[in-house]
């Protein structure tokens, strides 16, 4: 491995700590006469028991004539913030863009003041963004609620329209059914009303036409009826019912003659009275 850069001085033989007024005067007078081309050899040439790095920092940060004293202005702070976004913690580059300001001062003002201010501003912006987002959500909800009510009202109106359409459909169906019923009544064949005072010969003619159309069936039916009558007469003769029927017929005939005789007597009597 390489040894690296050699130290500028022996740390055991140099003085540390704050600078005295005499040390500041020696450094200022030497730089005004000889300049500061080589900081490594400057302490020995100026008669200072200090390190070259310590002399450089003392001159740059405190003793040079163009060093600004006091607080940083608002413009300087904004410049430091912008440069820090570009260069980061490279304080020497930032100091080169700000004449009269040292890198040590810039670093101190950044850590003590500007960094805290940026963090507070970012938190404030985040809070504002959250509040704006909540306001936008509330506005959207308020806008959506009238739309929802409008949609609900529209649904009610549409349901009412649907009910009206359904009722109209039912009415149309009923009227159509009534109309079809009327058409069926019109299309029914008219029944001929037969007069009650028809000539009895018509019915005999109809019966005759039936008998003419079916002579064989009529003859077969009459033969069957004759057979049934013969069978009933045979049964009455076997049971003795035929004699009883003859006696009843004779009694009825006798009673009828008696009634006719009595009625004729009454009529003659009435004629005599009158």
Curated annotation (Swiss-Prot):
One CC-aspect GO term: nucleus
InterPro entries per the UniProt record, alphabetical: Homeodomain-like_sf, Myb_dom, Myb_TF_plants, SANT/Myb
Residue ranges, annotated region (Disordered): 121-160, 237-274
Tissue: Expressed in leaves. Specifically expressed in fibers and vessels undergoing secondary wall thickening, especially in inflorescence stems.
SUPFAM superfamilies, A to Z: Homeodomain-like
Protein's gene: MYB58
Protein location: Nucleus
PANTHER family attached to this UniProt entry: MYB FAMILY TRANSCRIPTION FACTOR, TRANSCRIPTION FACTOR MYB58
SMART domains cross-referenced by the UniProt entry: SANT
Domain of life assignment: Eukaryota
The organism of origin for this protein: Arabidopsis thaliana (Mouse-ear cress)
Biased composition (Low complexity): 263-274
Role according to the record: Transcriptional activator that binds DNA to the AC cis-elements 5'-ACCTACC-3', 5'-ACCAACC-3' and 5'-ACCTAAC-3' of promoters and specifically activates lignin biosynthetic genes during secondary wall formation mediated by SND1.
Residue ranges of domain HTH myb-type in the record: 11-63, 64-118
Protein name: Transcription factor MYB58
Annotated Pfam families: Myb_DNA-binding
UniProtKB keywords: Activator, DNA-binding, Lignin biosynthesis, Nucleus, Repeat, Transcription, Transcription regulation
GO-annotated biological processes: lignin biosynthetic process; positive regulation of DNA-templated transcription; regulation of secondary cell wall biogenesis; response to light stimulus
Factors inducing expression: Slightly induced by light. Regulated by the SND1 close homologs NST1, NST2, VND6, and VND7 and their downstream targets MYB46 and MYB83.
């Amino acid at each position: 491995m390489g040894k690296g850069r050699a130290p500028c001085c022996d740390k055991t033989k140099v003085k540390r700590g704050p600078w005295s007024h005499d040390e500041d005067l020696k450094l200022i007078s030497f730089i005004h006469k000889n300049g500061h081309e080589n900081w490594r050899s400057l302490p020995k040439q100026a008669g200072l028991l200090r390190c070259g790095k310590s002399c450089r920092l003392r001159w740059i940060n405190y003793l040079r004539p163009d060093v600004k004293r006091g607080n940083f202005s608002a413009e300087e702070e904004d410049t430091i913030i912008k440069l820090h976004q570009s260069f980061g913690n490279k304080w020497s580059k930032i100091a080169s863009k700000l004449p009269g300001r040292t890198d040590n001062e810039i670093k101190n003002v950044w850590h003590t003041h500007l960094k805290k201010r940026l963090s507070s501003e970012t938190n404030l912006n985040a809070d504002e963004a959250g509040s704006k987002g909540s306001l936008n959500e509330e506005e959207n909800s308020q806008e959506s609620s009238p739309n929802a009510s409008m949609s609900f009202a529209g649904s009610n109106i549409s349901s009412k329209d649907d009910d009206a359409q359904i009722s109209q459909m039912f009415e149309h169906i009923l009227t159509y059914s009534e109309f079809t019923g009327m058409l069926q009544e019109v299309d029914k064949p008219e029944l001929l009303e037969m007069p009650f005072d028809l000539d009895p010969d018509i019915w005999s003619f109809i019966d005759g036409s039936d008998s003419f159309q079916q002579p064989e069936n009529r003859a077969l039916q009459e033969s069957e009826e004759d057979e049934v009558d013969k069978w009933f007469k045979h049964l009455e003769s076997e049971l003795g019912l035929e004699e009883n029927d003859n006696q009843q017929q004779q009694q009825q005939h006798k009673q009828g003659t008696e009634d006719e005789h009595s009625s004729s007597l009454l009529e003659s009597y009435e004629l005599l009275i009158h």
